[in-house]
């Protein structure tokens, strides 16, 4: 279970060089097997609730770093586990206070955008979390950022 990422490089001719212009990032998320969950666990599951799943960082200065906080709450009846996390951009930094939340517990996830790295990736910045919530085993926080023109 977890997330695996790699890059595939395409070439049209023999001798083509590997570079960002012919790179295709590939990621695979293997979700937890919830088929062996007990009756009690299936009737009392953990439930993840995020304060936001879309963040916007408008009008950043070219070398600016700016942060926002997403609250993660377990509104379910058993412990919530954030089992894996993948950050899909070198422009993002993520700090998560806790990976296991008891029922009713909340933690903070701080997401920082580094404006100088925004243009370096082809994919849209996002954070993918793998959880033991049977209804949301995979949850994504999307990030939009724009840089002011000088």
Label for each model-derived stretch:
Residues 77-106:
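Surface-exposed binding patches on compact interaction domains or structured appendages
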Residues 1-10, 21-23, 62-69, 116-128:
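Short, solvent-exposed loop/turn segments enriched in Ser/Thr/Gly
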Residues 56-58, 96-101, 115:
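Beta-strand-rich interaction surfaces with strong enrichment in secreted/lumenal proteins
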Residues 11-71, 75-76, 134-150:
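Long, low-complexity ectodomains and other extracytoplasmic segments of secretory-pathway proteins
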